[in-house]
């Protein structure tokens, strides 16, 4: 289950126009730095057995939810493997759940500004972990082609996750506002969704390439990730 501190509410004035949005983005970024860290994460001991409700499409909601679909796609890829002894898989699963939470915050229209910004920060933190571990796997991989492929996909992640934090802050300032046009709000949502899709796809590809690279690591290298396939429930 998700755990967080009470996020509270921003008490913004209601200026008009695009300059107001930019001003609020800057204010939100300043205030978020002062906030204590809040984590949307699962305990690692239940991660493997947890079937998250956040990744299900609620009744009455449209099926076409691209951000949630991207989270589901990454989660399906990550849950092929046990996260025990594999921090890349554990971080990828956290990212999928966090992205599903972000989808809920954005989709519902009732999301809390601070919760959305914090969720983006937590996603960025998990993505940094994936990138760091993937680079270590690449460093130890003896196959040049596989090593190059892994580095190419994982090195995209930091830039995309940084963009996610910025776009989430922009979108957060619009939540609950009545003086933002539908066009501006929709544009901000579309940019955020597109970024989320790119991030989930990059992490998904990183998981696949890291597994391939792990096979090409010398046993005496001193660095290992445990890649244990999970047995499907129907077997």
From Swiss-Prot:
Keywords: Actin-binding, Cell adhesion, Cell junction, Cell membrane, Cell projection, Cytoplasm, Cytoskeleton, Lipoprotein, Membrane, Phosphoprotein, Repeat. Pfam families: Vinculin. The keyword Phosphoprotein applies. Gene3D superfamilies: Alpha-catenin/vinculin-like (1.20.120.230). GO terms for cellular component: adherens junction; cell projection; cytoplasm; focal adhesion; podosome; sarcolemma. It is a peripheral membrane protein. It comes from the Eukaryota. The keyword Ligase does not apply. InterPro entries: Alpha-catenin/vinculin-like_sf (IPR036723), Vinculin (IPR017997), Vinculin/catenin (IPR006077). Belongs to the vinculin/alpha-catenin family. Exhibits self-association properties. Involved in cell adhesion. May be involved in the attachment of the actin-based microfilaments to the plasma membrane. This is Vinculin. The lineage of its organism: Eukaryota, Metazoa, Chordata, Craniata, Vertebrata. The gene is vcl.
């Amino acid at each position: 289950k998700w755990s967080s501190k009470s996020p509270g509410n921003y008490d913004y004035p209601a200026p008009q126009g695009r300059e107001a949005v930019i001003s609020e983005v800057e204010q939100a970024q300043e205030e978020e730095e002062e906030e204590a860290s809040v984590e949307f994460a699962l305990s690692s001991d239940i991660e493997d057995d947890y079937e998250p409700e956040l990744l299900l499409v609620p009744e009455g909601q449209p099926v076409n939810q691209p951000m949630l679909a991207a989270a589901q796609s990454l989660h399906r890829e990550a849950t092929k493997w046990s996260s025990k002894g594999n921090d890349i898989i554990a971080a990828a699963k956290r990212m999928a759940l966090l992205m599903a939470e972000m989808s809920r915050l954005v989709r519902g229209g009732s999301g809390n500004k601070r919760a959305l910004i914090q969720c983006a920060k937590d996603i960025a933190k998990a993505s940094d972990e994936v990138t760091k571990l993937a680079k270590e796997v690449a460093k130890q991989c003896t196959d040049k082609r596989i090593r190059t492929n892994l580095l190419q996909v994982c090195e995209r992640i930091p830039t995309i996750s940084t963009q996610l934090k910025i776009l989430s802050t922009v979108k957060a300032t619009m939540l609950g506002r009545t003086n933002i046009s539908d066009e501006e709000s929709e544009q901000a949502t579309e940019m955020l969704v597109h970024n989320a899709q790119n991030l989930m796809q990059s992490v998904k590809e990183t998981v696949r390439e890291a597994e391939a690279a792990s096979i090409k690591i010398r046993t005496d290298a001193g660095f290992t990730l445990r890649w244990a396939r999970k047995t499907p429930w129907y077997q």
